[in-house]
Swiss-Prot record:
Gene: clpX
Similarity-based family: Belongs to the ClpX chaperone family.
Cell wall biogenesis/degradation among keywords: no
Binding site for Zn(2+): C17, C20, C39, C42
Domain ClpX-type ZB: 5-58
Positions contributing to ATP binding: P121, T122, G123, S124, G125, K126, T127, L128
Protein name: ATP-dependent Clp protease ATP-binding subunit ClpX
Amino acid sequence: MTDKDNGRDDGGKLLYCSFCGKSQHEVRKLIAGPSVFVCDECVELCNDIIREELQEQSSSAGAGLPRPHEINQVLDEFVVGQEHAKKVLSVAVYNHYKRLEAGSRKDEVELSKSNILLIGPTGSGKTLLAETLARMLNVPFTIADATTLTEAGYVGEDVENIIQKLLQKCDYDVEKAQQGIVYIDEIDKVSRKADNPSITRDVSGEGVQQALLKLIEGTTASVPPQGGRKHPQQEFLQVDTGGILFICGGAFAGLDKVIQDRSEKGGIGFSAEIKSKDEKRSVGETLQDVEPEDLVKYGLIPEFVGRLPVVATLEELDEQALVEILSAPKNALVKQYQKLFEMEGVELEFREDALRAVARKAMDRKTGARGLRTILEHVLLDTMYDLPSMENVEKVVVDDAVIRGETRPYIIYGNQEQSRAASSD
């Protein structure tokens, strides 16, 4: 009698597959394990099942991809205002990942790559938009500073270092990196000094744009492995950048004047449109009329502008928007500081006039949302320093006088209220 469960007969001679029951003579290979045997046919069958499941997952990737409306809703949770930019980004990102899905199928129509250019003042939310997109889509994300980049062979970072940073974010998983998002900040700082080609070599301006061309359009970049130059004998990793979404951002100070000059030239003499002082448009409204020729005039080379077909402009944040940024988003600064104080068992309250005072201060400094944390950190520094050593504190209150530096945060103790700073106790 044969014991098929153990893969042996009573005599201990003939072996059987524990899954399909075939003997060792009916299959090419029988692999032994602890009290179990598996034949090559069952191994191949398992591989086929796994392969089919992976194909089903990749074919349904488009179904799992958030729709533009859903992408916009998530952006609304973290970014205040900038409705036009959110809509442009939602559509561009959706189409980009639909393009990657279509790329795996053979079709007559080949979808071209649509990288994104974000134009807006400092602190308007360019970086936060890109970060939120990457976090929502669960793809690798890295930020590169264009001002540190130079042409290959010169002192500074090579453009290939951008891809290496992306690989580091996903533990050198090439497949994941090839679907990541790269945000290149301060791209306006690599504009050439004049719109006429320079005789001298511009290694940190036009040279960087030239170096970025192929990377952004889609090429196979050779990136050193984890060891880098310490292990030169290792083979370089080959990364196809065709599926990587590149988002370039910059303040482009003075671009509004370039746009105005172009629009004013369009109407001279009797056909000129005369505008009163009241009809003067804001910088944000002017930037919405940006054309590729304006970017070329500003200092970007035509080929580089052509690689960034999707352009989204962001408006300068007003006082009300800054107040909302302080308190409304999921990870708003006020909520973050309230969480820190809550860990000490203390309630932190910001009054409405305090939030407006912080917003006005940020506007005076022209730092946008980026300067809000600096202001709050300065205001709460002494309180956060002394609070862990204090007892019986129930609440800390901040009003506009505290923001203006006229007084310190009010400390409310258990069963009594005292108007004194944490540092005075």
